[in-house]
Regions:
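Serine/threonine-rich low-complexity intrinsically disordered regions
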Residues: 33, 55, 68, 76, ...
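Generic detector of bulky aromatic hydrophobic side chains
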Residues: 26, 42, 96, 130, ...
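Nucleotide-state-sensitive switch-loop elements of NTP-binding domains
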Residues: 2-16, 21-117, 121-129
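C-terminal accessory "lid"/substrate-recognition subdomains
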Residues: 4, 155-213
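Phosphate/Mg2+-binding loops and adjacent switch elements
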Residues: 91-177, 182
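Short, low-complexity, polar/charged sequence segments that are solvent-exposed and flexible
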Residues: 32, 62-66, 113, 137-141, ...
Length: 213
């Protein structure tokens, strides 16, 4: 989360992942937490309907307005800003549809909206299959996420496979593995450097400068 919010900027918290991957539960728990929900007027955009439903009575404050978005054709800058203004929201939380490209949402952001945090959720056992069958979509999800949570993780899951899928897209994404009992393991797999530090001339691509320095 950004520490300082420029005047008139609308923070956006984006939650992406396939249907029933845990987005609704995480958002519900987040809005129940007074450390996140301290009374700011919040617009919650729900772009898909899964098995779980929101319980506004459990939110930390009654300051959240829920709006359903039924089609990708509704993801337009003017329409998004219209929904925000109707409830005078100071920030926006988005449960994004698991079959829509997150990049489409990024391109449709109204001028004063800024994504402050983006989380991706995936079921650990099924994600490699999704990745094999819908590679363009999983790539776009990972490319627009800062943090990915693989839930329903257990010892039968291939952690290295999950790690490699993520790292093939970005070395900067944080990875966590959540077990059924709620315990979380953070990814600590060390990746080889993407350049040869022993070469006579070290060739570093632009995206790898931060790793070098």
């Amino acid at each position: 989360m950004k520490n300082q919010q420029p005047a008139n900027e609308i923070p956006v918290y984006l939650f992406i992942g396939f249907l029933d991957s845990g987005k609704t539960r995480f958002i519900q728990e987040t809005l129940e937490d007074p450390r996140f929900n301290a009374g700011e007027k919040t617009l919650l955009l729900v772009c898909e309907q899964g098995e779980e439903e929101y319980d506004p009575s459990r939110f930390a404050f009654p300051n959240v307005v829920i709006r359903n978005v039924d089609g990708i054709d509704e993801i337009l800058p003017a329409n998004l800003e219209k929904m925000r203004k109707e409830c005078d929201a100071e920030r926006v939380v988005v449960e994004y549809n698991g079959m829509w490209m997150p990049s489409d949402f990024m391109m449709a952001l109204p001028e004063d909206w800024a994504v402050y945090q983006s989380f991706m959720f995936a079921e650990a056992k099924s994600f490699p299959v999704y990745n094999a069958n819908m590679r363009n979509l999983t790539f776009d999800m990972l490319n627009n996420a800062e943090f990915v949570v693989f839930n329903r993780y257990d010892d039968s899951c291939d952690k290295m496979t999950l790690h490699k899928i993520v790292r093939a897209v970005s070395r900067g994404i944080q990875i966590a593995y959540e077990r059924e009992d709620g315990t979380v393991e953070y990814d600590e797999i060390v990746d080889p450097l993407p350049f040869d530090i022993n070469a006579p001339v070290i060739v570093i691509e632009d995206k790898d400068y931060a790793l070098f320095y």
